[in-house]
C-alpha cells in the first residue's frame, strides 16, 4: 500500500487553518498519484490506490469539517469512493469468476459456461463504469 505524502512543517503552534490547507493538499496530491493508471484503461492497482487515498482525504475533511466549507467537497469525495468501489468490486468478482471457470470440471461444460457467462456480464458492467471514471 502506498504511504501517504508526509506533511512537513507542522508543529504545535501551527494555525489550524494553515495546518488544514497543508494536510488537505497532501491528501489531494495522494489522490492524484494513481491517475496515470486511468489513462489507457483502468488497472486494478490504480483503483485500489485511489480508493485508499480518497479514504484518507475524506478522513481529513471530516477532521477539519468544523472549519466550514468542506461538506460539498466531502460529498464529492464520497461519490468518487462509491464509483471506485463499484469498479473494484467488479474487478474482484471477474477475477474470482475467472479462477472458478478455470477450476470447473472439464466434464461439466455447463458449469464452466455458466460461470463464464456470469463473468462476461460482470465485465460488461465494468466497461461502462470504467468509462465513467475516465470521463
Where are each of the predicted segments found?
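Cationic, histidine-enriched alpha-helical/coil surfaces that engage anionic ligands
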Residues: 1-135
Amino acid at each position: 500500500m502506498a504511504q501517504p505524502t508526509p506533511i512537513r512543517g507542522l508543529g504545535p503552534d501551527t494555525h489550524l487553518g494553515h495546518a488544514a490547507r497543508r494536510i488537505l493538499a497532501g491528501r489531494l496530491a495522494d489522490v492524484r498519484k494513481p491517475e496515470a493508471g486511468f489513462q489507457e484503461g483502468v488497472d486494478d492497482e490504480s483503483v485500489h490506490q485511489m480508493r485508499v487515498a480518497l479514504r484518507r482525504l475524506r478522513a481529513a475533511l471530516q477532521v477539519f469539517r468544523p472549519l466550514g466549507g468542506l461538506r460539498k467537497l466531502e460529498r464529492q469525495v464520497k461519490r468518487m469512493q462509491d464509483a471506485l468501489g463499484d469498479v473494484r468490486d467488479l474487478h474482484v468478482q471477474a477475477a474470482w469468476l475467472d479462477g472458478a471457470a478455470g477450476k470447473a470440471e472439464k466434464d461439466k461444460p455447463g458449469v464452466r459456461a455458466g460461470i463464464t457467462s456470469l463473468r462476461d456480464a460482470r465485465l460488461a458492467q465494468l466497461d461502462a463504469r470504467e468509462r465513467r471514471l475516465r470521463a
